[in-house]
Structure formats: structure tokens, C-alpha cells
């Protein structure tokens, strides 16, 4: 059985005194020999880390002792090797860059749909009010190429900062439909859903926990291919197993 535990987690929450927090996170994660990346900003935290299960648990216990992060939810997957070469803890202006300061997820979340409910909507073709469901992929084009939901809308953006302009260009096509924004782990689709709601798009949801949580709870119903990840695994299949070689061949 693979011995390396990989976690992905984020939370939009007001954080201050970032240099001190960075030093503390770097010290605690380094002390238990974790590898990966942690991003800190005034709007929250975003992390991807790998290590042994007991070390991951030790670090999460320490992190959640901070009342601001007590409910931090992590998504887990396994691998044979550590997919990161070093530990990096960075301070950023945003934990996911959008360049729209008015969008502040730390002040309130967009409505979310659970993986189980979404799987039911996709199977029946409409939401619980009978509206057509549009799956909107908020990821970069090269990520989408590794796999996405069947029939998903893909605006072929090259970076997330292009998403707002794409919304303005395609907003009319979303009228009268339930729009579910999705991404790898939830962070981009959370900002995306808020931006669309601010832009006048009605009936917008984010997929709670992103593709990774959807894989974990539904086995990937209605999803074609694999989920691209930004580490040496390259992609995960619906069983959350590394599928890097398969994904590379599929997108070559």
C-alpha cells in the first residue's frame, strides 16, 4: 500500500501578521519533514503537502489549533513517492490570483452543491427546480485537457485572471440555467462563483471541495479522464491514484 499521504486544503479567512505565520508554518512543517507548498495571504491559506500519515496528522493538528483554521478541511490521496522536491511557504497578495479585489471570499461563501447532489443532478439532467445544469470548468485549458465533466463548458482560458473577461463574453449563454463552477480542489470555483453572482449570473453554485472531493465521494460519476494536479503525479484518476503517465500520453 502506498506510504505517502498527500493533502490539499484551503480556507478563505482573514489572516494577519503573515511574516510570523509564515515562519511558524515553515518551522512546523519542516520539523515533521513535509514537502510541498503553502500559500498565505490576507484572504486565507492554500496548501499542498505530502509526507507520512502520522506527520501529516501532527501538522494538521497544530494548524487547526489556530481558531481561524479550526475547521480547515483537507482532501487526502496516496502515492508511492513524495511528489514534491522541497517545502515552500510563500506570502502572496491572493491565495489564488484573480485580480478583482472586490471579490472577497473570506467575507462569505457562494452557495455550494455537494458531490452527491451534483451526481444526482447530472444523472437526471436538471437540478431540483427543473433547470438545466451547466458544468463550468474554471481551470486552465491544459488542465481541462487531462479530463473534465462530460459536456462541461470550457472557455480555454490560459490563466485564472482571464476568467472575469470570459464571464462577460459568455454571460448571456448562462441565463435560465443552473451554473456549477468546478476546479481541482475548490479554491478557484469558489472565487469564480462569487464573481459570476456579482456579475448578475443567477443560480450559481460552486462544487464543494472541487473535483478531488467529487472523486472521493462519488467515484467520478460523469467525469471523463483524470484530474490534473500541479505536482509530479501529473494527474489523479477517479480512484485518487496517480495517473501521470496516462495523462501525459492522453494530452501529448
Curated annotation (Swiss-Prot):
It holds the Pfam family UPF0176_N. Gene3D superfamilies: 3.30.70.100, Rhodanese-like domain. The keyword Oxidoreductase applies. Residues 129-223 form the Rhodanese domain. SMART domains: RHOD. Keywords: Oxidoreductase, tRNA processing. The active site is at residue 183. InterPro entries: Rhodanese-like_dom, Rhodanese-like_dom_sf, TrhO, TRHO_N. Its EC number is 1.14.-.-. It is an enzyme of class 1 (oxidoreductase). It catalyses: uridine(34) in tRNA + AH2 + O2 = 5-hydroxyuridine(34) in tRNA + A + H2O. One of its GO terms (molecular function) is oxidoreductase activity, acting on paired donors, with incorporation or reduction of molecular oxygen. GO terms for biological process: tRNA modification. SUPFAM superfamilies: Rhodanese/Cell cycle control phosphatase. Catalyzes oxygen-dependent 5-hydroxyuridine (ho5U) modification at position 34 in tRNAs. PANTHER family: RHODANESE-LIKE DOMAIN-CONTAINING PROTEIN 7-RELATED, THIOSULFATE SULFURTRANSFERASE/RHODANESE-LIKE DOMAIN-CONTAINING PROTEIN 2. Belongs to the TrhO family. This is tRNA uridine(34) hydroxylase. The gene is trhO.
